[in-house]
């Protein structure tokens, strides 16, 4: 019997690695969902693959590669490791001006050390720019020796996958809750509209910081039919933001397979499924 070819989706939340394995071509079925809890600092492992922590993390990927015939590994990158901004398309179209903006945004970082990706948005006169340090991507890719296709995806890209998978229609916000940041992505009629992220030291500051960011990003105050939350401490974040989100919006925490529209052999898990949501989306074939 021919071995099934699968995709692996991975994300990290506060000392835990969440993973999802789905058969190639699967739209709403996962083969396996799981998590690993580590005693070491995951950020150290990701930033220093040759450290003891990095070697232990790589061993986990090696075990998964042995267990499944993987064709593709997709990993979620943490928002604070990236720079996001929207720029007029005329900047994108002019190579000189484009490079000047990148140099300003990543001041002091040599151009060869910057990974640049441009994304289409609902307003065609703009482009959305995501910048990362190239070394970060090399670090992520170093955890797999066997799989040729190895992609790193941003929080705002998860919204596009959710839109294809769930087809919520209308408009929605997707809020990713991390230990020291939240990401906010807006979609309208299935198309990416805008995104930003908010850093914080104390979760109690989220509501104040939201108001501060909304002054410069008015789309955050716009009408959205649904607001989805995923990640860690989702209920706490939702509570902090309930006064600032349109009361007519349906607020949904993506913490069950039923809500996500996903089928799996197991129904209960020993971890919060809201933290596994990105890994699930990354494992599906949603192109």
Q: In which residue ranges do the predicted regions lie?
A:
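Non-catalytic, solvent-exposed interaction/assembly segments
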Residues: 1-103, 109
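Small-residue (GG/TT-enriched) beta-loop-alpha framework at ligand/catalytic clefts
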Residues: 2, 6-35, 119-223
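DNA replication sliding-clamp ring fold and its partner-interaction surfaces
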Residues: 46-62, 66, 72-75, 140-146, ...
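Active-site neighborhood for divalent-cation/phosphate handling
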Residues: 62, 72-164, 258-262
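Extended, charge-rich low-complexity interaction segments
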Residues: 67, 140-141, 179-182, 186-188, ...
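A short acidic (Asp/Glu
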Residues: 84-90, 185, 236-242
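Glycine-rich phosphate-binding loops at beta-strand->alpha-helix junctions
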Residues: 225-250
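Glycine-rich phosphate-binding/hydrolytic loop that grips phosphoryl groups
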Residues: 255-287
């Amino acid at each position: 019997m021919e071995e099934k070819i699968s995709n692996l989706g991975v994300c990290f939340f506060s000392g835990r690695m969440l993973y999802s394995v789905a058969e190639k071509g699967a739209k709403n079925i996962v083969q396996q969902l799981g998590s690993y809890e580590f005693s070491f600092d995951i950020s150290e492992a990701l930033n220093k693959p040759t450290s003891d922590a990095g070697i232990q993390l790589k061993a986990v990927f090696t075990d998964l590669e042995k267990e499944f015939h993987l064709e593709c590994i997709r990993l979620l990158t943490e928002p604070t490791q990236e720079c996001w901004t929207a720029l007029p398309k005329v900047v994108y179209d002019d190579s000189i001006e484009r490079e000047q903006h990148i140099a300003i945004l990543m001041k002091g970082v040599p151009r060869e050390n910057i990974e640049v990706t441009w994304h289409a948005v609902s307003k065609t006169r703009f482009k959305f720019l995501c910048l990362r340090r190239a070394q970060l991507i090399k670090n992520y890719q170093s955890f797999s020796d066997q799989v040729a296709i190895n992609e790193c995806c941003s929080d705002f890209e998860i919204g596009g996958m959710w839109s294809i998978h769930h087809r919520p229609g209308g408009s929605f916000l997707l809020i990713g809750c991390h230990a020291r940041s939240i990401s906010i992505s807006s979609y309208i009629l299935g198309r990416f509209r805008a995104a930003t992220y908010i850093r914080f030291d104390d979760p109690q500051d989220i509501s104040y910081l939201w108001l501060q960011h909304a002054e410069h990003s008015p789309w955050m105050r716009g009408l959205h039919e649904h607001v989805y939350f995923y990640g860690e401490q989702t209920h706490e974040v939702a509570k902090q933001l309930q006064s600032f989100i349109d009361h007519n919006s349906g607020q949904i925490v993506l913490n069950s397979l039923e809500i996500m529209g996903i089928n799996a052999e197991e129904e209960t898990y020993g971890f919060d499924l809201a933290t596994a949501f990105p890994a699930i989306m990354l494992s599906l074939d949603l192109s």
